[in-house]
From Swiss-Prot:
Family: Belongs to the small heat shock protein (HSP20) family.
InterPro entries linked to this entry: A-crystallin/Hsp20_dom, HSP20-like_chaperone, sHSP/HSP20, Small_HSP
Keyword Chaperone set for record: yes
Upper taxonomic lineage: Bacteria, Bacillati, Bacillota, Clostridia, Eubacteriales
The name this protein goes by in its record: 18 kDa heat shock protein
Keywords linked to the UniProt accession: Chaperone, Stress response
Function text: Probable chaperone.
Residues covered by the sHSP domain: 38-151
UniProt xrefs under Pfam families: HSP20 (PF00011)
Gene expressing this chain: hsp18
SUPFAM superfamilies the record matches: HSP20-like chaperones
Gene induction: By stress; by heat shock and also at the onset of solventogenesis.
Gene3D superfamilies: 2.60.40.790
Domain of life of the organism encoding this protein: Bacteria
Length: 151
């Protein structure tokens, strides 16, 4: 009605709706098993964060990632999750020749600001592609400080 079409590429750098969907379908149908849009660093990975009275619980979906390729760090009130994925799918015929060989590599990082955490009690587990992190809160009213000796 007013000529406003989302995803239109003019000289202003916006993409036309048709180009957006054409590219999406081209990428989808040309990449059999490892779509690049799911683990390329731009899309990120999905994270659920739940707050309870005494803790935060984080669940991060990391499909295709091995436990050894996950690094978890809590520093300066930031929880940082680093994950790498290196997948190789090989299919050979009876003569040991490759019929298909595909590789998929990706690296992701996400950081979250979470304060009032008892960092000595942070716990994490990884099962079935889901990283679960428990971040206990500091106890209210308890002296959470420590004495600092002067040398």
């Amino acid at each position: 009605m007013f000529g406003m079409v989302p995803f239109r590429r003019n000289n202003n750098g916006l993409m036309r709706r048709e180009d957006f969907f054409d590219k999406m379908f081209d990428n989808f149908f040309s990449d059999d098993f490892f779509p690049t849009t799911t683990f390329n660093g731009n899309a990120g990975f999905k994270v659920d964060i739940k707050e309870d009275d005494d803790k935060y619980t984080v669940a991060a979906d990391l499909p295709g990632v091995k436990k050894d390729n996950i690094e978890l760090q809590y520093e300066n009130n930031y929880l940082t999750i680093n994950a790498k994925r290196d997948d190789i799918v090989e299919t050979k015929d009876d003569n040991n020749n490759f019929v298909r060989r595909e590789r998929s590599y990706g690296e992701l990082r996400r950081s979250f600001y979470v304060d009032n955490i008892d960092d000595s009690k942070i716990d994490a587990s990884f099962l079935d592609g889901v990283l679960r992190i428990t971040l206990p809160k500091k106890v209210k009213g308890k002296d959470n400080g420590r004495r600092i000796d002067i040398h």
